Swiss-Prot record:
Gene3D superfamilies: Glutamine synthetase/guanido kinase, catalytic domain. It catalyses: L-arginyl-[protein] + ATP = N(omega)-phospho-L-arginyl-[protein] + ADP + H(+). CDD domains: bacterial_phosphagen_kinase. ATP binds at residues 24-28, 82, 115, 166-170, 197-202. The gene is mcsB. One of its GO terms (biological process) is phosphocreatine biosynthetic process. Pfam families: ATP-gua_Ptrans. Its EC number is 2.7.14.1. One of its GO terms (cellular component) is extracellular space. It is an enzyme of class 2 (transferase). This is Protein-arginine kinase.
Length: 335
């Protein structure tokens, strides 16, 4: 019986068609409470639980999930779905509040007391900001948020002071990556206050030619400025990726076709495969589909990139290794 990978991803991601380059977009707002020390300085776990209770009371329309009541596998599933950060999982008194389709998550007691996230599948940062801002307004009505008239919102990390906003877009960039253009792009956008990271943010590894592009600074900038500037940067990167793909198709079609079919062969025939190799093979097959080299019915890149992660493969009643189960899953779904 074929495994149902559709159950692994959030409802918001199921609702939209996959695009050649944009995987997802996110707006994150960092907020702190005036009457509590910052989470990294909590004198006891009880202080963290008090913050959780206050935020829960302020956001009664969201569902609370306390991480200290979850097993490690359940926590890592939330990380894989980008609903919480790896850092939140490490905190002893932490929680996340979610809406029904998981397009909104509110992390409690990570680096800051509150981190509001709004998630979407296209370049709709302004809409996402409006959604996050509504949550922020609810918190502001019920809680005493740390704010300075001259500096703006006060955050644990100095780079977040100001709007407290991080806007980011996840991009699939196999062309630029294969042609080794990513370092140059990263250096260029860094000069304008933007950065490129792995799929889980700062310090994380790049999998499957997927990169996260985000703003670095918020002080002295409005939310609209950050969104407009990031949108412009992302559109420039997308255009470069499209140009590279056209060049690969026109001038390196045999090599590109070979790369695509080699990856397809590996995915369809492997009995053992690592997360890293699987992600890059999937990326190259998606490139082949986007270039109309191959046609695979029901190929869901975003869903597979979630499903191949270890938290969704671990099963105490199954004696296969994770790498074996990953290979079996990919053979089932790529035909």
């Amino acid at each position: 019986m074929m495994s149902n990978i559709h159950t692994n991803i959030s409802e918001w991601m199921k609702m939209s068609e996959e695009t050649p380059v944009i995987i997802s977009s996110r707006i994150r707002l960092a907020r702190n409470l005036e009457n509590h020390v910052h989470p990294l300085m909590f004198p006891s776990e009880q202080e963290g639980y008090r913050v959780i209770n206050e935020v829960q009371d302020a956001l009664s329309n969201l569902t609370l999930n306390r991480l200290d009541t979850m097993d490690q596998q359940s926590k890592m599933k939330l990380v894989a779905k980008h609903l919480v950060s790896p850092e939140l999982v490490k905190q002893p008194a932490s929680a996340v509040m979610l809406n029904d389709d998981e397009s909104v998550s509110v992390m409690i007691n990570e680096e800051d007391h509150i981190r509001i996230q709004a998630l979407g599948t296209d370049l709709s940062l302004k809409d996402l900001y409006q959604r996050a801002s509504k949550i922020d307004d609810e918190l502001d009505k019920a809680l005493d948020i740390s704010y300075d008239e001259h500096l703006g919102y006060l955050t644990t990390c100095p780079t977040n002071i100001g709007t407290g906003m991080r806007a980011s877009v996840m991009l699939h960039l196999p062309g630029l990556s294969i042609m080794k253009r990513m370092n140059r792009i990263a250096q260029t956008i860094n000069r304008f206050g933007f950065t490129i990271r792995g799929i889980y943010g700062e310090g994380s590894q790049v999998y499957g030619h997927i990169y996260q592009v985000s703003n670095q600074l918020t002080l002295g900038k409005t939310e609209e400025d950050i969104i407009d500037n990031l949108t412009e940067v992302v559109n420039q990167i997308i255009n470069e990726e499209k140009q590279i793909r056209e060049r690969l198709d026109k001038h390196n079609s045999v090599e590109t076709l070979d790369r695509v079919y080699r990856s397809l062969g590996v995915l369809q025939n492997s009995r053992i495969i690592s997360m890293e190799e699987a992600s890059y093979r999937l990326s190259e097959v998606k490139l082949g589909i986007d270039l109309n080299y191959i046609l695979l019915e029901n190929f869901k890149f975003n869903e597979l990139m979630v499903a191949i992660q270890s938290p969704f493969l671990i099963d105490d009643d199954d004696n296969r290794t994770v790498n074996e189960k990953r290979a079996d899953l990919l053979r089932e779904h790529i035909k």
